[in-house]
Amino acid sequence: MNRLFIEPALGKGYPADESLKFLEKLQLQNKTWKYTDRLHFNFDFIGLQYYFPVVVKHNNYTPVVQATEVKAATRKVPYTAMGWEINADSFYRTIKKIWLYGGVKEIIITENGAAFKDELKNGVIDDAARIDYFKQHLQAVLKAKKEGVNIKGYFARTLMDNFEWSEGYRPRFGLVHVDAKTQLRTIKKSGYWWRDFLQ
């Protein structure tokens, strides 16, 4: 779905290939479709928020797109506490795809992170899975940079556990654990890892 926004914004028009065939019906219903040139903008940078890939399979019974998601657990691949697939190679391919559109001056990774079932034990949160996640995804960024992609920044999601719009306080993305009742902050091992990595 990213293509529906980024391609017109980069002056490529709306996608017209087989994978987005359902757009033909929308195109016929939308009289402004021919004015896609008005959507083109000369961006200073493209901000990329990446968490996980979505794998779908054909389904005639799903309206419009005729596809349904195949969850990571079903496919027996690594996933987070939210069921999101962990796939740094997909992150790398997404960065490259955006860069190869042409006309992109810079890419900034504005969000990248994962929620895991963090447990506070004896004042310590050993979130090794989050550290592995960041290592894998930073390797993807470095690989893309070495291949000429102009990546100017990377923002880890997030400093502290916070309120998620659709999930409340249950998912924990932070490098710092927050006890919602007492407001006590505890730096997770991933927080210390980032400190050491940046030094």
Where on the chain are the PLM-derived regions?
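Active-site region of glycoside hydrolase catalytic domains
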Residues: 1-199
